[in-house]
Amino acid sequence: MLDLNIQNETSRLRTVVLGTAFHNGPIPTIEECYDPKSKIHVIAGTYPKEQDMIFEMESVARVFEKYGIKVFRPKVIENYNQIFSRDIGFVIEDKFITANILPDRDLEISAIDHVLGQIPKENRISLPEDCHVEGGDVMPWNNYIFIGTYSGKDYPEYITARTNVNAVKAIQELFPTKIVKSFELRKSNDNAKENALHLDCCFQPIGKDKAILHKNGFLIEEEFLWLVDFFGKENIFEISKDEMYQMNSNVFSISENIIVSEQNFTRLNTWLVEKGFTVEKVTYAEIAKQEGLLRCSTLPLVRD
């Protein structure tokens, strides 16, 4: 059986689900796109090729192998996008919470049945149907759980709004001893530079006390400033709108001092090295065309 343990975003990783790009399916139509960035690349004819995405994901698998991390992969479903495993579930403490994701993506959950079957039933949780949540919006951080959400009355109109207030309340009830802190995110169905698809598109804690942050991803300035105060301005790497668009905040921590990052994130990677991090650079620019990167395509199950 799997002894799940996730207390935060950066303790030493031991076991993870990494998505797969095999048999990813045809290029979607504009109507089939779930996010504005994918739409841009469908229209431009630059939507990523399957072989390029496979190459990128296997390079991440090799990094995990280098550090002795146990890696699970989803069972491959023909003609189906299974890259972003973070969307389908998440772990807090010893509980696996199945995400209530977009209906078109339900098959993704069945593709990790071989993983879920190793988790005790009492530790597998499905939230009520009216609780919409995806793993990219949920960040355990020791005594806190940070959650990205959108509470506007026009929530149903945004395919980019993935986590609702009902889910925030449900997670607080599941973990009564944790401090659940929610953040209203900026949403756009059409402008990728004005859209924080998930919380990890504009924020991520790294190391012991540092964070990557993009101000415009937050609808309410006070909530952005709360994070600045929480981590301390000197510990924050603030990214520009273009860097947010390129997914700079969506790196992935193997430990408190080892981070997997995209090789083209020059400014961020330089800062990370200056701060004492080991940076494992990979090519992930094709995956990024679907408005997701390294954190989005990983689902940590066990950390120290």
Regions found by a protein language model. Give the residues of each.
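The feature marks the mature, well-folded catalytic cores of soluble enzymes
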Residues: M1-D304
